[in-house]
UniProtKB/Swiss-Prot annotation:
One of its GO terms (cellular component) is cytosolic large ribosomal subunit. PANTHER family: CHLOROPLAST 50S RIBOSOMAL PROTEIN L22-RELATED, LARGE RIBOSOMAL SUBUNIT PROTEIN UL22M. It comes from Methylibium petroleiphilum (strain ATCC BAA-1232 / LMG 22953 / PM1). The keyword NAD does not apply. The keyword Ligase does not apply. This is Large ribosomal subunit protein uL22.
Amino acid sequence: METRAIVRGVRLSVDKGRPVADLVRGKKVDQALNILEFTQKKAAVIIKKALESAIANAEHNDGADIDELKVKTIHVEQGATLKRFSARAKGRGNRISKPTCHIFVTVGN
């Protein structure tokens, strides 16, 4: 049985989120949480929250045993880009792009 958790619109670049997701793909849930706990990246904190949500969904909705769960799939997709303006010299302006992403986590036996 597979259970999902989706986090959308996270203020994180896809290029910074995917390497952290690769660290925990296919691992047991307790091992994945341990890896994310000691990974010093902003993405690790966000992905850990998504993984904890997927675990809670599996336990509450499906009655799954937490000790047997594994991270089946985890992927980070590109979201909308927030475009901002920064004033520059001589009346000019530059665009600042603030990327977002969507995180999809699936856990199962």
